[in-house]
A protein has these predicted regions:
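Alpha-helix capping/helix-boundary segments
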Residues: 9, 41-42, 82, 101, ...
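Generic structural signal for small/hydrophobic residues in well-ordered secondary structure
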Residues: 7-8, 45, 86, 105
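Short, well-structured N-terminal submotif of metal-dependent ribonuclease cores
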Residues: 1-38, 51-66, 70, 108, ...
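Signature tryptophan residues that serve as conserved aromatic anchors
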Residues: 12-13, 43, 128
């Protein structure tokens, strides 16, 4: 299965945080699954670190790509198609970071690893 990690799932995986559900942890750890980290998550982490909302993310904000790769995650860039799909989504979810992740999950046929239940309203598979 192709998994797109929501930003909090990525953070909790890297920090070993118990907030990450057992289902999510097992799916990410499963060598039969391919896990992806979006450029949108790098943007979100770095932005929130810069403005003081994620002080614990200093290590990650400094090298999201390198740390993600070291954990076996594949980088997912944001394409024009992702932008088009994200812009056309119904306004159920207002967060621009999550909207681009939703668009990527739809476009790339990925399940999203997220505790955010509202993502399921977009018809994507959500693991938690």
């Amino acid at each position: 299965m192709r998994l797109l990690l929501d930003t909090h799932a990525l953070m909790w995986w890297l920090l070993g945080d118990d907030a990450l559900s057992a289902t999510a942890r097992n799916a990410i750890a499963d060598p039969g699954n391919d896990s992806f980290v979006s450029a949108a998550s790098a943007w979100e982490i770095t932005t929130k670190y810069r403005i003081g909302k994620l002080p614990q993310a200093a290590f990650l904000a400094a090298d999201v790509a390198g740390i993600a790769a070291a954990h076996g995650f594949t980088e997912l860039s944001i394409s024009i198609r992702h932008g088009q799909v994200g812009g056309s989504l119904p306004g159920i979810h207002k967060d621009p970071f999550d909207r681009i992740l939703i668009a990527q999950a739809i476009t790339e046929d990925m399940a999203i690893v997220s505790r955010d239940a509202i993502l399921g309203a977009y018809g994507i598979v959500r693991l938690w």
